[in-house]
Design a protein with these regions (language model features):
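Conserved active-site tyrosine of GNAT-family acetyltransferases
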Residues: 120-122, 271-272, 276
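A structural microfeature
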Residues: 66, 131-132, 214, 244, ...
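Acyl-donor-binding surface of acyltransferase catalytic domains
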Residues: 71-151, 282-287
Length: 287
């Protein structure tokens, strides 16, 4: 091995890091997050990108073998590690503690349950698990079928950007906390121009008045046969009607013929009702 490291350069490293994540992907995230996880964040306005120079890449000659990075918040640190390079785990944990962002001295390490070498390194360095949860994944070997309730329909392509924005504003609780949506759609430009965007697969459900009331984004990742769903939301007054389940069934219908074998979900018990199974153990470590 000829191991070297340097800091992440956002303007030139993204595609190589994306390819690295494609190469090491496993369904239980034993080697780290899937590639669209980071691209979605970097393309979104909610991620603070002012500290990405703190992220670090390790190489074996010219091959990327490890990455330490943050997403949101900046104090949550993630680890991607190529199989065969577990010897770097302790160095990665030490770097995270020493150099990755902290606020008021606080920081968390996000280590997935299947990341055994990193878990052992964190324990050895005095970190302890604060809490965790299981993210659910839908196996496409089992058909996913849900019908839209009466009074709703799938929006025609291309989707209306403004309607998507307003749906997400309401669906993620911003209207209740900050007031009505202000009409700004500019922030969507980063997502629309992301290098691996597959927004043409996104699903929106509208009511009889033509308002979007449920939205499901799709980052189709053919190299991993992964249907990476992000985001998913329903406007509060239209919840508990089966809209999100119908949106996911439509994503299944659109991506399975492309070769998708599974779709990511989340930790909410709602996913259990649509046939998702716990697959990815999230664990948050503190000192």
């Amino acid at each position: 091995m000829n191991i070297t490291h340097r800091q992440y350069r956002i303007l030139s490293d993204h595609i190589a890091v994306y390819q690295f994540m494609l190469e090491i992907y496993e369904c239980d995230w034993r080697n780290g997050v899937p590639a669209p996880f980071l691209e979605y964040a970097l393309s979104s306005d909610w991620m603070d990108k002012s500290l990405v120079h703190r992220n670090r890449i390790w190489f074996d000659d010219d091959k990327i073998v490890a990455l330490v990075f943050y997403e949101n918040p900046v104090t949550d640190v993630y680890f991607s590690l190529r199989p065969g390079y577990e010897c770097l785990a302790e160095e990665m944990i030490a770097y995270a503690e020493t150099c990755m962002p902290k606020k008021e001295g606080k920081q968390r390490l996000v280590i997935f349950g299947a990341q055994k070498a990193l878990t052992a390194a964190a324990q050895k360095a005095g970190w302890h698990k604060e809490f965790g949860y299981w993210e659910k994944v839908r196996d496409f070997a089992v058909p996913l079928e849900r019908k839209l309730p009466k009074g709703y329909r799938f929006a025609s392509a291309p989707l209306d950007v403004a309607k998507c924005c307003e749906c997400c504003w309401k669906g993620f609780g911003h209207e209740a906390e900050e007031g009505p949506w202000d009409g700004d759609t500019e922030y969507t430009g980063g997502l629309a121009t992301a290098p691996h965007s597959t927004a043409h697969l996104d699903v929106a459900i509208e009511n009889e008045d033509g308002e979007y009331v449920c939205y499901a984004g799709m980052w189709w990742t053919p190299e991993n046969k992964l249907a990476y769903m992000e985001p998913l939301c329903t406007v509060p007054e239209h919840r508990r009607k089966g809209l999100a389940a119908a949106a996911m069934a439509e994503l299944y219908r659109r991506t399975k013929p492309l070769g998708a074998t599974h779709m990511t979900g989340g930790g909410d018990p709602f996913y259990d009702k649509v046939g998702f199974k716990p697959e990815i153990e999230w664990a948050f470590w503190v000192k």
